Amino acid sequence: MKKGLFITVEGIEGAGKTTNLNFIRSILEESGEEVVMTREPGGTPMAEEVRELLLRPREEAVSSTAELLLMFAARAQHLEQKIKPTIERGVHVLSDRFTDATYAYQGGGRGLSWAMIQDLEKLVQAGFKPDLTLLLRIDPETGMARARKRGALDRFEREKLEFYFCVQEGYMKRVAEDPERFLVVDAQQSLEEVQAAIAQGLAAKLAG
């Protein structure tokens, strides 16, 4: 049986990930493909509990290293219980964030060692990575203005603007390391232009 594709969507807050995740799902389903949607951190009952720990605003300062380890703990569970079994069945998995977000947020935003993240990635993933990653790139000021309109902010959304410029740099460093895997789209274009670029990139991946 042919394995399903593992497709991830990345970007800072306000980049339009939810809208475009649903757009990708509709393209795949209209072509007769089965798709499972998931997210990180989260994706399984245990991993969702870790997500709540990570995102809930709290008075206690959270160690950046603790944050990183929790991300990979949730990812280990997510991979073994959901992502890998699903693609083995020939079903595509579409995820709102994956390991690139860890490099961007904990590496770029928090300033943690890239090498430390790489070591954890090797331990947890053993070479496993997405087949295609869509990175929606948006100016952090624009993205955060959009995010604030959605209502209550989680612990990450409360970070200062400078944090998101560092996150964006982290994402672009990841693109430079593995350019063939990424489809980078300017999310400040009109929705029609963004989705035309996504559709073209997805079609090329499916054809390959």
From Swiss-Prot:
Reaction(s) the record says it catalyses: dTMP + ATP = dTDP + ADP
Job description of the protein: Phosphorylation of dTMP to form dTDP in both de novo and salvage pathways of dTTP synthesis.
Superkingdom assignment: Bacteria
E.C. number: 2.7.4.9
Family that this chain belongs to: Belongs to the thymidylate kinase family.
Record key words, sorted: ATP-binding, Kinase, Nucleotide biosynthesis, Nucleotide-binding, Transferase
Enzyme class: transferase
Lineage: Bacteria, Pseudomonadati, Pseudomonadota, Gammaproteobacteria, Oceanospirillales
GO BP terms, alphabetized: dTDP biosynthetic process; dTTP biosynthetic process; dUDP biosynthetic process
GO MF annotation: an example: ATP binding
Gene Ontology annotations for the cellular component aspect, listed alphabetically: cytosol
Gene3D superfamilies referenced in this protein's UniProt entry, alphabetically: P-loop containing nucleotide triphosphate hydrolases (3.40.50.300)
UniProt xrefs under CDD domains: TMPK (cd01672)
Keyword Acetylation: no
Protein name: Thymidylate kinase
Keyword match Cytoplasm: no
Binding-site positions, ATP: 11-18
